[in-house]
Design a protein with these regions (language model features):
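Positively charged, solvent-exposed patches that mediate nucleic-acid binding
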Residues: 1-119
């Protein structure tokens, strides 16, 4: 049996109004330099977005790398998360440069457990 480890378009938070709603009405959980914002939705799947300001991390290639790491951590672990949430990962200014995938996955799992969405 092949597991579904894709990151489909329907799973992405893209619209500004969706991000604003999660910021306004969602709950926050923090682990170091990452904040997870969580809001229940009416869908049968999770939708995920990433927020990294250019003011906090100046170089685009660094911002993109961080997003890739957390996108991969979500993609590989989404089957062990409860469904029906809009999730936004916010990266703060004190992010360290040499961050690995293993560290991203550990932070992702810790935040998911803290938020109560880990099965």
């Amino acid at each position: 049996m092949i597991s579904d480890e894709t990151f489909a378009k329907q799973e992405r938070l893209i619209k500004t109004k969706d991000f604003r709603k999660v910021y306004k009405d969602g709950r926050s959980y923090r682990a170091g330099f990452i904040i997870l914002r969580l809001l229940p939705n009416a869908a049968l799947m999770n939708r995920v977005g990433f927020s990294i300001s250019a003011q906090s991390i100046k170089r685009a290639f660094r911002r993109n790398r961080i997003k890739r790491l957390f996108r991969e951590a979500y993609r590989r672990n989404k089957n062990i998360l409860r469904k029906g949430f809009d999730i936004v990962f916010v990266v703060r200014r004190d992010f360290k440069e040499n961050f690995s995938y293993a560290e991203a996955q550990q932070v992702f799992l810790n935040l998911s457990k803290q938020a109560g969405i880990l099965l």
